[in-house]
């Protein structure tokens, strides 16, 4: 991602409806995981550290980001253990974390299986990864190019990548679902006129007037409530996966709700 685009994202991280909505969805999923108090947590690709603020209520949080601007921003928020690193080479020991969050990072990596394998390395046995990614390659747009994405995902493609890296699937749900139809129509219209434009691709994340911002956030409030109840949404602009690091190399149970709890660090042998 270009530094100019990254700085723009940092500026809207606190205030944009999309980031607030994604944090709500994450919080809803973490409620279902019943994160034990004191769990060691890693935010992979932590950006400004805003998500680390929320995660720190659950336990000690470490973070890393490839962009030094994000690392500095997270440190300025008071997070001491934030490092400059790539998801393909995480600067932590094997089995260090009960919970790992990886929000809209995998699409930036040329080899997502390698990245998922490295994330699994630093997860403890039974540890959980919560990852979000953009959905549907057919929705590829200037926004993806501006942010140097390699791909968008379907549930099946993310599940295959996770399995290849050794993760057991726990649950998958799409989100940002209500806005999918208008967003798809808009991107189709943009694609049909793209050949007429000479401007470079640019991010579509920008601040909107307060009332519009709140209106756009409202659907994700509803979706977060549904996810908290265990309801999985069949389509959306984004996809959330919960994956578990196998204990003893066995295969996990992918039935609805199976495995949606973290190991208790007080009972762990780590």
Range-by-range predicted roles:
Residues 1-95, 99-103, 114-116, 210, ...:
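Conserved N-terminal segment of class I S-adenosyl-L-methionine
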Residues 11-13, 129-151, 155-163:
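Short, glycine-/aromatic-enriched active-site segment of Class I SAM-dependent methyltransferases
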Residues 103-106, 132:
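Residues lining the SAM
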Residues 113-128:
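A short glycine-rich, Lys/Arg-flanked "PGG" loop and its adjoining helix->strand segment in the class I
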Residues 167-177:
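Conserved S-adenosyl-L-methionine
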Residues 182-218:
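C-terminal helical/coil "lid" or tail adjacent to the Rossmann-like core of SAM-dependent
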Residues 219-256, 260-270:
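C-terminal lobe and adjacent flexible extensions of AdoMet/dcAdoMet transferase-like proteins
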């Amino acid at each position: 991602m270009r530094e100019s685009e990254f700085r723009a994202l940092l500026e809207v991280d606190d205030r944009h409806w999309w980031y607030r909505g994604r944090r709500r969805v994450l919080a809803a999923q973490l409620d279902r995981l019943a994160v034990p108090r004191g769990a060691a947590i890693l935010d992979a690709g932590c950006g400004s550290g805003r998500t680390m603020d929320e995660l720190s209520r659950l336990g000690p949080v470490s973070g890393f980001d490839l962009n030094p601007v994000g690392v500095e921003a997270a440190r300025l928020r008071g997070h001491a253990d934030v490092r400059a690193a790539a998801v393909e080479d995480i600067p932590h020991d094997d089995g260090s974390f009960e919970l790992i969050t990886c929000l809209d990072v995998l699409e930036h990596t040329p080899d997502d299986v390698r990245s998922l394998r490295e994330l699994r390395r630093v997860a403890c046995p039974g540890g959980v990864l919560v990852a979000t990614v953009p959905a549907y390659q057919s929705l590829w747009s200037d926004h993806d190019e501006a942010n140097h994405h390699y791909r968008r995902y379907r549930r099946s493609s993310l599940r295959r990548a996770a399995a290849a890296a050794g993760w057991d699937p726990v649950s998958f749900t799409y989100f940002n679902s209500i806005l999918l139809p208008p967003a798809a129509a808009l991107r189709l219209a943009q694609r049909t006129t793209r050949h007429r434009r000479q401007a470079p691709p640019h991010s579509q994340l920008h601040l909107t007037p307060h009332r519009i911002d709140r209106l756009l956030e409202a659907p994700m409030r509803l979706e977060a409530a549904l996810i908290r109840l265990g309801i999985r949404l069949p389509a959306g602009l984004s996809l959330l996966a919960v994956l578990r690091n196998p204990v003893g190399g066995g295969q996990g149970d992918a039935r609805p709700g199976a495995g949606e709890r973290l190991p208790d660090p007080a009972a762990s042998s780590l």
